[in-house]
């Protein structure tokens, strides 16, 4: 593998970016088993559902790696650049990983009338690694109510118990499982005989032992992070289906906050807190084999302060498409992506990011038999 390091230079013929090589090999094995029983039972004149089950999994991993010296700074004149011959360090065996998870779960859905339903369940999970052994009973519950044939409201509660592989910088060991609680309230809807569906949800999640800023750590050859408590809360809105016989729409918008409860600062600022996705396609009535469409993807600003501040302002991407069914087996399709040639960064983390694809176009012929 090759890692990029450094910052681009704008004053001379060097890019300011050097290459660092690594040899890395990992062997891993995962074994899983599951048993589940489902059934129905009658109570108080209603039929209800229930299920119980057992999950077991075991994960083992062992890795060995060696870092080489820098290949030198890449010049902007690539034909004249000659990389330096690296010298390699000794091979290092990373600490082995082993995780065994066992869980027993049970749940039931109770029909308390034609429109009201309760969901109750619990999950006992035991997690054992080379660094710790933890267990927890995680209950969950939900309620749904059909206000009308078109609208259903719901509320849910879930207890969280999730293993992680990141190194806790305070203990220098694998971080203990994330624990927390999640709440959600929402309404789901269905119109036009199910051709169009919508939803709106409000949620809040509190999590302890959360990896606040995971960065690749050469000392452990895996991600390490300070551990803390976070709260995420927000709103999601969606609409999917047919507005008319010829017009299809997919709409999604979400806004949320992720807060470090100990410092009061924004958590994971490299994750957008607002996103909007709109996709529409239209079948031309006069030419029913022809379909045209467009999509817009937007997100608000993000930034990364792992080593130095790198910021990406809010941006939107515009894509278009057109397809034509020559017959039942052959279809022609043309796509145009990022039509405005927006320049943007993705994957900001650890002081690095990747430029998204510039404006590009594709023509395809698809065969189906």
Question: Residues of each region from the PLM?
Answer:
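Transmembrane beta-strands of outer-membrane beta-barrel pores
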Residues: 1, 56-60, 122-128, 157-163, ...
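Gram-negative outer-membrane beta-barrel transporters
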Residues: 114-115, 204-206, 225-306, 340, ...
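Residue-level signature of outer-membrane beta-barrel architecture
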Residues: 39-42, 110-111, 135, 144-146, ...
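Residues that define the transmembrane beta-barrel architecture of outer-membrane proteins
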Residues: 27-31, 98-102, 133-137, 179-183, ...
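Membrane-embedded beta-barrel scaffold of Gram-negative outer-membrane proteins
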Residues: 1-4, 146, 153, 177-242, ...
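Face-selective signature of the C-terminal outer-membrane beta-barrel domain
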Residues: 19-131
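Repeated loop/turn-to-beta-strand initiation elements of outer-membrane beta-barrel proteins
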Residues: 45, 115-120, 149-153, 193-198, ...
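Conserved C-terminal beta-signal and adjacent last beta-strands/turns
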Residues: 50, 183, 269-369
């Amino acid at each position: 593998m090759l890692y990029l390091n450094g910052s681009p230079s704008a004053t001379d013929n060097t890019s300011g970016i050097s290459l660092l090589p690594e040899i890395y090999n990992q062997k891993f094995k995962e074994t899983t088993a599951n048993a589940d029983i489902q059934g129905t039972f009658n109570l108080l004149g209603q039929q209800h559902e229930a299920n119980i089950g057992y999950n077991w999994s075991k994960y083992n991993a062992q890795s060995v790696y060696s870092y080489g010296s820098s290949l030198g700074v890449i010049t902007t004149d690539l034909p004249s650049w000659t990389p330096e011959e690296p010298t390699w360090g000794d091979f290092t065996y990373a600490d082995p990983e082993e995780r065994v998870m066992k869980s027993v779960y049970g749940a039931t859905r109770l029909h308390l009338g034609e429109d009201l339903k309760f969901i109750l369940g619990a999950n006992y999970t035991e997690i054992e690694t080379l660094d710790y052994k933890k267990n927890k009973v995680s209950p969950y519950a939900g309620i749904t109510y059909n206000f009308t044939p078109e609208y259903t409201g719901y509320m849910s509660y879930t207890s969280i118990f999730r293993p992680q592989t990141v190194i806790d910088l305070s203990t220098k060991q694998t971080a203990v499982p994330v624990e927390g609680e999640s709440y959600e309230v929402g309404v789901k809807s269905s119109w036009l005989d199910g051709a169009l569906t919508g939803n709106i949800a409000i949620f809040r999640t509190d999590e302890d032992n959360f990896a606040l800023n995971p960065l690749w750590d050469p000392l452990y050859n895996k991600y390490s992070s300070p551990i803390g408590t976070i709260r995420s809360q927000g709103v999601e809105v969606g609409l999917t289906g047919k507005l008319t016989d010829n017009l299809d729409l997919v709409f999604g918008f979400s806004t949320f906050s992720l807060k470090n409860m100990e410092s009061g600062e924004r958590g994971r600022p490299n994750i957008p807190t607002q996103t909007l996705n709109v996709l529409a396609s239209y079948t031309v009535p006069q030419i029913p084999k022809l379909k045209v469409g467009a999509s817009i993807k937007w997100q608000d600003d993000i930034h990364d302060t792992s080593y130095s501040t790198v910021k990406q302002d809010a941006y939107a991407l515009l894509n278009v498409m057109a397809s034509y069914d020559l017959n039942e087996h052959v279809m022609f399709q043309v796509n145009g992506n990022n039509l405005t040639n927006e320049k943007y960064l993705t994957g900001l983390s650890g002081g690095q990011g990747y430029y998204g694809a510039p404006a590009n176009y594709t023509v395809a012929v698809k065969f189906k038999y």
